[in-house]
Amino acid sequence: MDFANIASQLNAGTILPEGIVILTLLGVLIVDLILGRTSARWIGYLAIAGLFTSIVALYFQWDNPNPISFTGGFNGDDLSIVFRGIIALSAAVTILMSIRYVDQSGTPLAEFIAILLSATLGGMFLSGASELVMIFISLETLSISSYLLTGYTKRDPRSNEAALKYLLIGASSTAVFLYGVSLLYGLSGGQTELSAIANGIATAKVGQSLGLVIALVFAIAGIGFKISAAPFHQWTPDVYEGAPTPVIAFLSVGSKAAGFALAIRLLTTAFPLVADEWRFVFTALAVLSMILGNVVALAQTSMKRMLAYSSIAQAGFVMIGLIAGTQAGYASMIFYLLVYLFMNLCGFTCIILFSLRTGTDQIAEYSGLYQKDPLLTLGLSIALLSLGGIPPLAGFFGKIYLFWAGWQAGLYWLVLLGLVTTVVSIYYYIRVVKMMVVKEPHEMSDAVKNYPQVRWDLPGLRPLQVGLVITLIATSLAGILSNPLFTLANNSISNTPFLQATINSHVEAQNLLLLPKLDSVSQSQPSVDSTAKI
């Protein structure tokens, strides 16, 4: 047996960041078994240290000349590195905001962190999976861990209800997605690698067959569930309202990023022959998500439900970059997910702090908060205004890049719809900000009138403060200093070969569509000679 050949085919060094997360997960469980409840004081910091070590390992893998591992099952290219970094960073910030919250709920912190690390592991593997079996295993690891996290506070009936709904709808979407990829397997002649699937379908000459279209629709249904796109969003409001707040913070960023990573890799690699069809479907999803998410958010009275519908709308904005299919489109998509990480987690950190001190998440109860807790008011205001796209915050530049990429790609009416729905979203974000900064004492809510003294020295509150300050600074400065982040996003696209091939073929197809129009214009104009004769 040639072990050197086997080692070169496995290329296990590519998944070193995931290996570090696995070791961190095992370390958390072992330390908890040995020390018991006394480990809760610092076990969260152990997990955060492991996640940041994983991010450092990702940094050193940038522009890896040999990113393929597990005989083609995993691709550690620069695109996957960015998405894996987003997921790991979102998990680290989630742990910061979870320590006090989980302790107050009376549930073990070590088990919570272990399940969260499992979800992180699934999301990181999903970001680079380039083979059907790897995709399914990674997707299930992320999904099952998410179900467990959603129902982690067993004493809360709302958490149990949210977990059951999430499980039932998630299992159904997984079954639909699995049926779609099984059709791909059959149409390609038994191939499981995404690139081999495309070649197999082209060889079998079934590029426009009904079976391939059905496979595409079912695959998009599974992806739509993961990114909370309408009309696959039914689980989102109930799960966001009932699940523990740190869990939905991770789902809104880490799980969504993994879903978009899967969408890019699966659709561009396995479905190149029906590229126009999947772009049309995603255009419909983007329109529905932007309209439904922003309009329904206007009527919400719960802060978490409002952010649930906001998350649906944000998915619609990100899809503009995917539909554009250009270098600028994919780069703006990744840039927006990077800044969305900071502004969304900043908002959820503030919601956790408010709920810990008042026991409610009703929007009306935030009235007059500025007079009792200026830092929390500032953090939540910056996060909401950034989500709305107010300059000069990070969300403004994220939306500008997305809309510019869409306009350059000819998606004029989709960009105009995005602008209109952005204006709608600004209304319900500013409504909350205005409510928090009222000055009249009689306008204060009962929760704010009875607001406890702000103390950061209580157990578990210092990590929350650190998480709030870090995400607040990042949200405030990521827009003004956006060039490094956009360069990172742009380089991740430029250094990913399969995506460059997809972009070039899309540009060539667009040019071929423009040629007849240019010919007709040139034929309609009189030549110089004929004009001279006249």
Curated annotation (Swiss-Prot):
GO molecular function, one term: quinone binding
Pfam families for the chain: Ndh2_N, Proton_antipo_M
Catalysed reactions listed for this entry: a plastoquinone + NADH + (n+1) H(+)(in) = a plastoquinol + NAD(+) + n H(+)(out); a plastoquinone + NADPH + (n+1) H(+)(in) = a plastoquinol + NADP(+) + n H(+)(out)
Cited InterPro entries: NADH-Q_OxRdtase_suN/2, ND/Mrp_TM, Ndh2_N
Disulfide bond positions: none
Enzyme class: translocase
Main location: membrane
Source superkingdom: Bacteria
Membrane spanning residue stretches: 15-35, 42-62, 79-99, 109-129, 132-152, 167-187, 210-230, 244-264, 280-300, 306-326, 334-354, 378-398, 410-432, 466-486
Membrane topology note: Multi-pass membrane protein
Function of the molecule: NDH-1 shuttles electrons from an unknown electron donor, via FMN and iron-sulfur (Fe-S) centers, to quinones in the respiratory and/or the photosynthetic chain. The immediate electron acceptor for the enzyme in this species is believed to be plastoquinone. Couples the redox reaction to proton translocation, and thus conserves the redox energy in a proton gradient. Cyanobacterial NDH-1 also plays a role in inorganic carbon-concentration.
Quaternary data: NDH-1 can be composed of about 15 different subunits; different subcomplexes with different compositions have been identified which probably have different functions.
Family: Belongs to the complex I subunit 2 family.
Protein's name according to its UniProt entry: NAD(P)H-quinone oxidoreductase subunit 2
Natural source organism: Nostoc punctiforme (strain ATCC 29133 / PCC 73102)
